[in-house]
């Protein structure tokens, strides 16, 4: 722990906590201050001036990052018949029906994305208490309840991310790995920011983005100037 603390202190010394950096400067600092012994994920965080208690100010959706996330997603699909075969052909890791419900209820959670055809939601609904808190419940807004299972699987495997504002208006998303070229991280960050800008509720008042930051796993948080995005 002492060694890690020393590394963190060294990283913190390189970052001015009172400054909002340009996206290019922030990404460069993320790479420079990373001390994890593995390929750390890079995450962005937004604090939005919204009231999620109001139905028209809830922000939730999905997008495909131009350069992917660097993570191999394990995709589970609830489907039957031809749609099950379609999911398998598209590269889904797990495909099934009641058998998967029983397995998940038994404690199995070795997957990252859950997709379902609309007709399967009746049985998937039984898993609400398990999948809901983990943000894994299929939802039409994120494209995970769909008849086009092949497209959904391919997008999930190809860098699709989901996002959702929490009760405090915070939105977080992984935009890549520290090993990515800086320009690819910048491009992913800007693409996600574009989605955040377009997601602004028409009824939101005042400054929309009150804070934007970027960090890496076990790394330091760096404030980002939204105007640079």
UniProtKB/Swiss-Prot annotation:
CDD domains the record matches: Ribosomal_L1
Family: Belongs to the universal ribosomal protein uL1 family.
Keywords: Repressor, Ribonucleoprotein, Ribosomal protein, RNA-binding, rRNA-binding, Translation regulation, tRNA-binding
Subunit record text: Part of the 50S ribosomal subunit.
UniProt-recorded name of the protein: Large ribosomal subunit protein uL1
A Pfam entry, by short name: Ribosomal_L1
Signal peptide from the UniProt entry: none
Role, per record: Binds directly to 23S rRNA. The L1 stalk is quite mobile in the ribosome, and is involved in E site tRNA release. Protein L1 is also a translational repressor protein, it controls the translation of the L11 operon by binding to its mRNA.
The organism's place on the tree of life at top rank: Bacteria
Listed HAMAP family: Ribosomal_uL1_B
GO MF annotations, alphabetized: rRNA binding; structural constituent of ribosome; tRNA binding
GO cellular component: large ribosomal subunit
An individual GO BP term: regulation of translation
